[in-house]
Amino acid sequence: NAPGQPHPREGLRQNWQQLSPGFKRFLLPAGVFALGYFSLGFFLLRAHDVGFSMTDVVLLYALFNTTCVVVAPLVGHLGDRVGRSRIVLLGYGAYAGLNLWMVFAGTRWEMIAVFCIYGVFYAIEESQSKAFIADIEPERRATAMGAYNFVTGLLYLPASLVAGALWTLSPSLAFGLAAALSLAAMAVFVRVRPAAGPAQ
């Protein structure tokens, strides 16, 4: 290191210490949720098992993306009106509901509905979680976003690995665990009540 420059580890520690308690509390439910947030590929695979051809599975993926794009502006507007923490909590609940539904879903129409709702959930997860972080950490937004991506990124991999292992026993086990962890994340979120700014 150049003279006068802090050691990288010291810089990371200092950045972490400067982050607000509210943001650090938010990492708890975010981490629990990430443990159950496995790849969309499992949903696509389940749709194929139900009877969708590979071409139809691609169309389901397109439906998911289209729903996400259409709903995203509405989700953002709703977050501004009712508070982003409520929308984040709604996202956790939507993912729990999706996975519970997948435990019992066995028809094509149910799968179509699932992928529409998944698009709504994804719009919430991709936009409102990050917007909520910006509310909590307006001055250290980049540092907070990096910490959030680091923590959740570490947990996404084991989430898919565990889901894959459970899938070999029964797809219902994988979806059931994801639903349970999503509900647990909701409970932790309500318990720790991470604080946000005026939009809250």
What is the role of each PLM region?
Residues 86-101:
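Structural signature of the two symmetry-related core transmembrane helices
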Residues 71-83, 167:
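Helix-to-loop junctions at the C-terminal end of transmembrane segments
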Residues 65-73, 153-157:
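Residue-level signature of mid-helix packing/kink "hotspots" within the transmembrane helices
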Residues 1, 176-200:
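Multi-pass alpha-helical transporter architecture, strongest
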Residues 1-29:
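Juxtamembrane intracellular "pre-TM" segments in multi-pass secondary transporters
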